[in-house]
Amino acid sequence: MPVIETRVGTGAGQQEKRAAYGALIQTLRERHARVLGGGGEKLQARHRERGKIPVRERIDLLVDPLSPFLELSPLAAWELYGNEVPAAGIVTGIGVVAGTPCMIIANDATVKGGSFFHETVK
């Protein structure tokens, strides 16, 4: 098989772009980590005390083992409402259930008691 030669530059300009891109990726990862916490540790604990399963764990139990779940809008409502509505209070995505690809929509009750916002249904 022939070797594909790169056209990507290795100069200072390219290194600056790479560093800037790395910073953007880090910001994205931090935001995703914050969203995964839902309404926060206190509300997650209260949810568990009531015998309820957090939203992303419910999805993990629903989808086929070892199958991927593609979350579609984890940053919905980001920087709105003082960032108190992670993922607009809802988790949406595509997962495989019983061998069939399915659209999955699950409410996160730890975010504002499960209230819907404009961005939740947008």
Give the ranges of each region predicted by the language model:
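Terminal-region recognition feature
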Residues: 1-122
